[in-house]
Every structure is written in structure tokens, then in C-alpha cells.
Amino acid sequence: MKRCLKFFFLIFALSASVVLRADTDAEVSARKDALELAGAFGNDGFKIRDGHSCGVLKSHDHALVTVNLYAGNQYWFSVGTAEPLKKVGVSVYDETGSKMTTENFSDGDKAAAGFAPENSGQYFVSVDSVEDQEGSFCLVYSYK
């Protein structure tokens, strides 16, 4: 009985020490908007990549997300936002910090950047708060 009790206590202690961060309602709303925008690119043959990056942007701040991209593929980086954050910009930088030329889309609380890398490697996607607002955002990306 003591052994069973020790085992139960050990499992309880381990499970209590693991803290999982739950998505907030604002992040869920932002992800919904980002997936809706990314779904529109699906009509052109783009597939949505598993996973997403959510966070909170302060006013006139940015968030960087590291991605590995492959030459010959095309990518769309779609961002949705939640109130009070209404307007964001999306930019792509290479590993040296040079800003890449992208095709941009912006519509209210959604924005996207399209990019086709000439070289495979690590790139950085910047999500920027362009107005004096802060709030939640979510980034998803598509490829073909």
C-alpha cells in the first residue's frame, strides 16, 4: 500500500510541476482570423503548415519568429489580431538581417506577406505593431 501511495504522490507531484500555457480567448480569436486568411491562399494550392505562433505585441513593438524555408517553395505568412490591436505589418528577413522583398496584403485586423526564397535556410518573420495599439496576434504560414 505504501508503495502505491508513493507512486501516486510521485505522479501527482510531476503533473503539478508541469505548467502548460493555455491560449487566451484573444489568441484563439487571432488564430481564427489568421487561419481564415491562410485558407484563402489554399485556393491557390498553398498548404497550411502545422503549428502557429501567438503572442502579445506592445505598441510600436515587434515579434520575431524563426522559420526554415526552402528554395523553390513559395510561402505566405498570415497574421490575425485581436482587439485592441488592429493593424500589423509582416516582414521577412534573411539570416544576415536583410529585409526581403515580399508581396504584402493588409485588410483590417489581418495581414500577410508572400515570399519565395532563392536560397534555403533560416529566415525571420517580423510581426510589427504599426499603430499606437497593443494586443494579441497569431501567425500561421502556408507553402507550396
Regions found by a protein language model. Name each.
Residues 1-9:
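Bacterial N-terminal signal peptides that target proteins for export
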Residues 17-21:
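Hydrophobic alpha-helical segments of integral membrane proteins
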